[in-house]
Amino acid sequence: MYKRDTIAAIATCPNGGGVSILRLSGSKSIDVVKTVSLVSSNQCWHSHCILYGWIKDNEDQSFVDEVLILLMMAPRSYTAENVVEIHCHASIVLANEILRILVKQGVRLAKPGEFTMRAFLNGRIGLSQVESVLKVIHSKTIASAKLAANTLRRGGSERIRRLKHTLSLLLADLEFHIDFSDEFIDVDSIEDELRSTIQSSLLDIKDLISSYNKVSKLNEGTKVCIIGKPNVGKSSLLNAIAKRECSIVTNFPGTTRDIVSFETMLGNTLVRLYDTAGIRQSVDEIEKIGISKTELFVDECQIVFFVLDAIQGLSSEDSVIFNKLNLMNKNFVILINKIDKKVQRKIDEIYETLKCSNRRIIEVSAIKNIGLEKLNNCILDLSSKEDFDLPVHFSVNCKYLEILNNIYLILDELYTGSLNKSVTSYDFIAVELRRVLQGLNQITGDEVVENNVLDAIFSKFCVGK
């Protein structure tokens, strides 16, 4: 699976800049670079030194580019192998030419994520850290980047490793009890240890599982849903906030039949805006499906904007939606749109009708861009109220969540079921604890991972990482 040959790739984006970087990793990387470079004799090829020189083509002895060469000898490198970086001028033509010269010296082109895969296979980082590298690269907010970097720096899975250590000791004590139960083992003592350790483990796992929703908000952004009856200006509001036409706007009710989304940054907050199908009684089957999806989707959003039409005032259709939101126990904000139409009497009637609801009301005009600053501040305000302390050691992703849920079910069944029976089957508990440890090993990467699983993880990386 793991070829110990020397690999190379361009590590920087091809879209220009000041410098292009080529990266090599493997036992022959330093010798290869020595062969294709001209470096003055007073410079030493020592680890973690920077050399100045030229890359040359040995075929015609021509010079290709002026470069800096960074040396990182094993194991003090990203891959824990000998790593060399060549910094040349930011020309994709030059970078490709240097790469061609390296390949002619017997270096292989790296596959996507192969440098990080080598770091994992050489034991420098764990599997959770591998995924944190990917999260750092693809993070869209400062908070999510910090969380991923924190996971990467701390080894990613310290809490999981502590949990695994605790349960391993428990399993060892249990197996000792099983083997020597006829001699001198105190039955009450082992049962107390089982109950105490499993209970504390359940609390730890529950805390990790609960962090998933928090981390999801960081990675996916605050979900903001715009709802209301047809033609109140939901699509226009989305377009106004997005500052571009994301959603089709017409005078015909029911134009939006599916959920339209747009992602934007408000300050340091990632926001996902959703324009939804207008909620009303409809005979059109396709529109009815869109309305049904809207009603289900509202429950997933952290912020709901309920849009009213200042021209029409509060209608019976609006009242139906208002009551539905109250029944769902959603903390929604009321937007009175089209206030530029000089309909203050209707606006006053809306305030009078809703004065007992204690809902925040914002007056806006999507067409004239009135009230949008208040709207954006409202999003930031409500989003910040859902802020939380970042998990210190570990961020749970979707795959780990499934494993942790299964582990929780196993331990919960042991705690509430097996340990409360008149006759406790210690052999069964030992088997279940081994299943738990196997699951924890999958998270830390300590268990041998199938080739296709590794390939799936590292295929998400770019070449050069």
Swiss-Prot record:
One Pfam match: MnmE_helical
The protein's required cofactor(s) are namely: K(+)
Q: Does the keyword Amino-acid biosynthesis apply?
A: no
Record: residues binding Mg(2+) = 235, 256
Q: Which InterPro entries match?
A: G_TrmE, GTP-bd, GTP-bd_TrmE_N, GTPase_MnmE, MnmE_dom2, MnmE_helical, P-loop_NTPase, Small_GTP-bd
All residue ranges annotated as the TrmE-type G domain in the record: 221-384
Superkingdom in the source lineage: Eukaryota
Q: Does the keyword Amino-acid biosynthesis apply?
A: no
State the Gene Ontology BP annotations: tRNA methylation; tRNA wobble uridine modification
Assigned GO CC terms: chloroplast; cytosol
- Recite the UniProt keywords alphabetically: Chloroplast, GTP-binding, Hydrolase, Magnesium, Metal-binding, Nucleotide-binding, Plastid, Potassium, tRNA processing
Q: Binding positions for (6S)-5-formyl-5,6,7,8-tetrahydrofolate? A: 23, 85, 124, 465
**What subcellular compartments does it reside in?**
Plastid, Chloroplast
Enzyme Commission numbers on file:
3.6.-.-
Residues that coordinate or bind GTP: 231-236, 250-256, 275-278
The cofactor binding remark recorded in the entry reads: Binds 1 potassium ion per subunit.
Molecular function as annotated in GO: GTP binding; GTPase activity; metal ion binding
What's its top-level EC category?
A: hydrolase
Alphabetized HAMAP family for the sequence: GTPase_MnmE
Belongs to which family? Belongs to the TRAFAC class TrmE-Era-EngA-EngB-Septin-like GTPase superfamily. TrmE GTPase family.
What does the function comment of this entry state? Answer: Exhibits a very high intrinsic GTPase hydrolysis rate. Involved in the addition of a carboxymethylaminomethyl (cmnm) group at the wobble position (U34) of certain tRNAs, forming tRNA-cmnm(5)s(2)U34.
Instruction: Please give the name of this protein.
Output: Probable tRNA modification GTPase MnmE
UniProt source species = Cyanidium caldarium (Red alga)
